Amino acid sequence: MRQLKGKPKKETSKDKKERKQAMQEARQQITTVVLPTLAVVVLLIVVFVYVATRPAVTE
């Protein structure tokens, strides 16, 4: 049967499995890419603030 333009296609079990797989890969990518990157950025900010605000050593 021909699919009409305006109606969305009904999701099959195969489509549902593919969507779940994509969501799981996205979650895994968050833990392997986003969190370490965020940690590095926070660490750089902390180091910058520490260096900028430490008292000058006068001898």
From Swiss-Prot:
Residues 9-22 have a biased composition (Basic and acidic residues). Residues 9-31 form a coiled coil. Residues 1-23 are annotated as: Disordered. This is Single-pass membrane and coiled-coil domain-containing protein 4. It is found in: Membrane. One of its GO terms (cellular component) is membrane. Keywords: Coiled coil, Membrane, Transmembrane, Transmembrane helix. Belongs to the SMCO4 family. The keyword Membrane applies. InterPro entries: DUF4519 (IPR027960). It comes from the Eukaryota. It is a single-pass membrane protein. Its main location: membrane. Signal peptide: none annotated. The chain crosses the membrane at residues 32-52.
